[in-house]
Amino acid sequence: MTVLKVKFTKTKRDKLAQILWILNWVSVVSGIILFSLGLFLKIEIKKRNEVMAKGDINSVPNMLISVGVIACVVNFLGGKICYDCSDANKFSRWKLIMLPYIICTFCFTFCILLGALMCYTMRNELEESLYLGLRDAIKFYKDTDIPGRCFLKKTVDMLQIGFQCCGNNGFRDWFEVQWVSARYLNMASKEVMDRFKSNVDGKFLVDGVPFSCCNPSSPRPCIQYHLTNNSAHYNYDFLTEELNIWVKGCREALLEYYTAIMRSIGIAALLIWLFELSVLIGVRYLQTAMKNVLLQGDLQGESDGWLLENSFVETAKYNINIIKNLGKANQISTVSGMNDPNINVQNTNCGKSNVTAKSIPAAS
């Protein structure tokens, strides 16, 4: 039993072909949009790759870029096919190609859906990458003289200023690392040496944060050092007073930023997927309607078009059987209880012969 059968006249077939020709060109534009969105996301990730650990976070932009390029090629070809389908004589040259084209387009639209869903599922991978990357960036913040890390201080400072954040999880992360280079510490000072000896790691740890953590909107001058020491500042209570530094961690700020981008890209990709799916359904109706009109022999008459020739269950069983048969085609099968009668027969040209050769008497 056919699924969603529709009857088409000659006029309806021609209009459907023209509409699909236009929609395929619109789909080329949607492919360019997908490519642009993937490229934009890739650039945004690359901008801050210094504070991200290496991982599979580029899989989403790479998927969108690839799908966008494929969309342009597939829909350009689809536009040409639909344009020729308005003429039954031209359709005959595409007749054998249209069904494989529809199958490939279905797989391609599935990739669009997969790319859209990946925009919503990569949050955990992104969060882990940001956590590890920011942890290392804060750890190496002081290494301004080491090649490969000399610009890391500027990167972290610009990040904290731009995203109004401080530390990885919060400003307390700076309390746990030595973020002041030993080059700028007076080793002859007793206070400095006491700082080094005050912890088992032998690091210069202070309850302070870099200047980039300061909130310029605060009416009070930035309290950058001795944040937990109330007696070090006039009219200051660490527990009750609102601090004039950024409280939000940079991991949370970056995660919110990238999540908002990926959510918008995911919505756009889903809308493009629905549009591509509707175009694919239209192409399927056009293919079946043109195929049936050729079988009838009356190019001006009516013809039926459908989504599936059989029911969903029958179509699924048919495709599964095709896949099974393809797997069995690579295996050598033998009939049960029967052996090849020639399997143990020796070749007469191989090995030594036991027959004694007789000499031929010479003619007298």
Curated annotation (Swiss-Prot):
Location within or outside the cell: Membrane
GO CC terms of this entry: plasma membrane
Membrane topology of this protein: Multi-pass membrane protein
Lumenal side, ranges: 44-61, 124-264
TM annotation in the entry: 25-43, 62-80, 100-123, 265-290
Record bears the keyword Nucleotide-binding: no
Key words of the record: Glycoprotein, Membrane, Transmembrane, Transmembrane helix
Keyword flag Membrane: yes
Glycosylation sites: N229
Topology feature Cytoplasmic, residues: 1-24, 81-99, 291-364
InterPro entries in UniProt: Peripherin/rom-1, Peripherin/rom-1_CS, Peripherin_LEL, Tetraspanin/Peripherin, Tetraspanin_EC2_sf
UniProt-listed SUPFAM superfamilies: Tetraspanin
Main location: membrane
GO biological process: protein localization to plasma membrane; protein maturation; visual perception
Domain of life: Eukaryota
Family to which this protein belongs: Belongs to the PRPH2/ROM1 family.
Protein name as annotated: Photoreceptor outer segment membrane glycoprotein 2
Organism: Gallus gallus (Chicken)
Taxonomic path: Eukaryota, Metazoa, Chordata, Craniata, Vertebrata
